[in-house]
Amino acid sequence: MSLNNSSNVFLDSVPSNTNRFQVSVINENHESSAAADDNTDPPHYEETSFGDEAQKRLRISFRPGNQECYDNFLQSGETAKTDASFHAYDSHTNTYYLQTFGHNTMDAVPKIEYYRNTGSISGPKVNRPSLLEIHEQLAKNVAVTPSSADRVANGDGIPGDEQAENKEDDQAGVVKFGWVKGVLVRCMLNIWGVMLFIRLSWIVGEAGIGLGVLIILLSTMVTSITGLSTSAIATNGFVRGGGAYYLISRSLGPEFGGSIGLIFAFANAVAVAMYVVGFAETVVDLLKESDSMMVDPTNDIRIIGSITVVILLGISVAGMEWEAKAQVILLVILLIAIANFFIGTVIPSNNEKKSRGFFNYQASIFAENFGPRFTKGEGFFSVFAIFFPAATGILAGANISGDLEDPQDAIPRGTMLAIFITTVAYLGVAICVGACVVRDATGNMNDTIISGMNCNGSAACGLGYDFSRCRHEPCQYGLMNNFQVMSMVSGFGPLITAGIFSATLSSALASLVSAPKVFQALCKDNIYKALQFFAKGYGKNNEPLRGYILTFLIAMAFILIAELNTIAPIISNFFLASYALINFSCFHASYAKSPGWRPAYGIYNMWVSLFGAVLCCAVMFVINWWAAVITYVIEFFLYVYVTCKKPDVNWGSSTQALSYVSALDNALELTTVEDHVKNFRPQCIVLTGGPMTRPALLDITHAFTKNSGLCICCEVFVGPRKLCVKEMNSGMAKKQAWLIKNKIKAFYAAVAADCFRDGVRSLLQASGLGRMKPNTLVIGYKKNWRKAPLTEIENYVGIIHDAFDFEIGVVIVRISQGFDISQVLQVQEELERLEQERLALEATIKDNECEEESGGIRGLFKKAGKLNITKTTPKKDGSINTSQSMHVGEFNQKLVEASTQFKKKQEKGTIDVWWLFDDGGLTLLIPYILTLRKKWKDCKLRIYVGGKINRIEEEKIVMASLLSKFRIKFADIHIIGDINIRPNKESWKVFEEMIEPYRLHESCKDLTTAEKLKRETPWKITDAELEAVKEKSYRQVRLNELLQEHSRAANLIVLSLPVARKGSISDLLYMAWLEILTKNLPPVLLVRGNHKNVLTFYS
């Protein structure tokens, strides 16, 4: 519906007497016509104008009406349409989404296209207008190029890449099934297996009618709970192909899904062999009766099974439509066979059938068969283990979820109805056969007795037959002895044989289709990269032909074994493991309380699902304990494999949801615990900027926070807020991904601020959560401070003051080459861009077959490749490698090497700790933590403390005692008694030359000039200031001399950071202190804690 064709949107949607308001489109260039329209409106309309500019474009007229009609209009879908004549290209004059309640807005009404392609939904994806687009100011007279989202939203078509993505979905003629043919039929055929015809009567004979019904109901309980869980998961969003694998993987994640998906697909493949061999055994029995054996029973099973599986493969490869038709035909045969049995129970039995134990419905037989009579070696659980595989097959419909028209409706309805119908059939057959057939019969028609003679109390005796000798010798007939009881009871025996054929072939066909479908879905997710070959589909239905061939080969291999007694329990356990995980998935998703868990199918309970999972695990051990152990071992191995490989998928699993809930609960629980010195951990804010730009600073911090503390990489975007926020938001995910890729256990946080100091101040105050708040600020040393603008120096020193104000410790790290490698990264990005352009250009030339031009271009690149240049490329570990491609310079090469120095294992050496001032112990704790790391374990601690020359030995003993109480191992302790002596003249001269450009020298000038200079350059170092802190300046210079003397060969120096009292020491003088203190030394950590204890010797 176009607004150009109708000036009244709502009049086209609902009757005029119920319209609530009217939207009339008015030509912007013809205000006169607008005025005319205003005059023609019905007098009972209440008109509201929204400003002069809005009045020129549209008019909203409210009409009386009820809410119901209004809601009906909104639900009709018209509001989701847009007028192609109103374009989003003019950001000022045109109206956007004019039908969105008649407002001049870019806001879009809710549409399903906005929610597509979110990890589980296929179909065209449209992007709604972003928050910035509808929030930012509109620039007048600016032509905006329409985005793909705009074109789709305005009905102008789907972008090309999205069309390609959804080509498969848009293909005509794709076969999709409803809930009857797709789920109900398949589940019924898979559940009604050969057990129904040749084992159920034996189960009733062993367990009796009472326990037999209990066995059926117990099996049904397992399948029903699993069916409810399956229905809940299947209705919690759009379901793709993959069946049980898809449900489990999207609920519990790739680790569980990938492990169970592989064994579930394998189990279905082997199940094909199991059902085909069951069919072949029946055929071989018929051949025996007619004396038509080909070779021998075993080889005949192999021959018939091989031929059968080839035929089934042909039906499957022909397409799902042919396979579905075959399934319907087999179901009809099966239903006729079941009906034939029930009809046979009411047909009067002849003498031959009576001699075999069939007497029609008799109360005496029902009473006699009601209780159990287990033979030697059998019991309730052994009989249950034999029957339970007959109840499996409930996932046959879910396994082809990708071929269903509406999986969310079909899977719950078809699965639960199939369970109900098949359970009723099993119960009916069990009760009927138990009420009609005795347990033992001789089959001899001469075993009759005269009426009135003394009976042995058996039901058969009362009915004129004496089968008492079956107590002493084996008999061939009766529930306990004859597996063909249903064929005997039925009205026409060959129909039961046809039913057996139908049950086995239909189950084999369903498994032959399910296995490749599940396997293809698993391979498409690329969890096992080696199996990607089998992800390819063919034809309009995306048939997994490669998977069919693999399933055929597996089935053929097990058919050739021709003995299923060993593999059948493993198959059943594989299926049960899938059922257990489906139930656990439903419980886990409910327990995680994720807002995304909103199944449309509400008939489930999380605790019932958990009970079902436990029940499935118990049944696995009841059926076969060693098969259950094998299943768990295989699943555990695959789980560990997938976990180690860390597949790059994000399905919003309940495992992720529970991780969030656990983290939230733990964080809240932590707030109730008071801080204790024994639980202190370094929780650091690291001013790295982008994490990849200062890797060395991040590496050294990560070395003492990994697995023991919090590390937050912080970046401050300085500048206009609009630009900064845009840049910040666009890079956050990339930088956090870089941390994950490089296996750095840290968070990334960023703020936008007008100045650097304000941003850091915000981070210091607002970062963290509860008890997990930063207590240490880590920054790199500002190496270029003498060339930097004054504001940068003020900000740098200012953030140190701010940290101390917030009672946060400070760590300043200095290395000789500095930390910032952003220029190197820019060169790397430029090289990558040029390389991509070169490859694209060469590909274009090759495609166009322009040989002459191609030769010229390639020659150009070939010459360029001979230049002696250095290219930087990233290694797998995230470090930077250098190779000859472009000139970066010797300095950059050293910088690149320095950026990786803390990634490497440190050579055997020392960490020298100059613990000059007691800051609570942080200066000692950080190097101790470093020595616990693998990369630093060969470095020993040497402790240096200040003292008096005449008490060196006593103070050394005292410090050794303190360190022992702290349980900190050290290699040596040095007491420095000459810290306070003046440095030599050469060292002091270096310091004076350093600060000379920043001195005011007011004492050499008259008072007026000096005061004027102080006002104009308040940042300079005054003579009075320098004189007041002269002793402290001496100390910094002297400390550098001592560091050069004692620690020049150390791997790392950890040194107490001098504190500059606010208002007493200028920023430039403080920077000069730091410079002279750490000049020409190995890597240095200047550390100052917040003067609260972080070490204790109490237990």
Curated annotation (Swiss-Prot):
| Residues exposed to the Extracellular side | 199-201, 281-302, 349-379, 439-550, 593-609
Which BP terms from GO are recorded?
Answer: cell volume homeostasis; chloride ion homeostasis; chloride transmembrane transport; monoatomic ion transmembrane transport; monoatomic ion transport; potassium ion homeostasis; potassium ion import across plasma membrane; sodium ion homeostasis
Q: Which organism is it from?
A: Homo sapiens
Free-text description of this protein's post-translational modifications in UniProt: Phosphorylated at Ser-91, Thr-100 and Thr-105 by OXSR1/OSR1 and STK39/SPAK downstream of WNK kinases (WNK1, WNK2, WNK3 or WNK4), promoting its activity.
Q: Which InterPro entries match?
A: AA-permease/SLC12A_dom, AA_permease_N, SLC12_C, Slc12a1, SLC12A1/SLC12A2, SLC12A_fam
Q: Which UniProt keywords apply?
A: Bartter syndrome, Cell membrane, Chloride, Disease variant, Glycoprotein, Ion transport, Membrane, Neurodegeneration, Phosphoprotein, Potassium, Potassium transport, Sodium, Sodium transport, Symport, Transmembrane, Transmembrane helix, Transport
Tell me how this protein assembles: When phosphorylated, interacts with PPP3CB.
Record membrane topology:
Multi-pass membrane protein
The protein in question is named: Solute carrier family 12 member 1
Q: Which family does it belong to?
A: Belongs to the SLC12A transporter family.
UniProt note on regulation of activity: Activated following phosphorylation by OXSR1/OSR1 and STK39/SPAK downstream of WNK kinases (WNK1, WNK2, WNK3 or WNK4).
Give the gene name.
SLC12A1
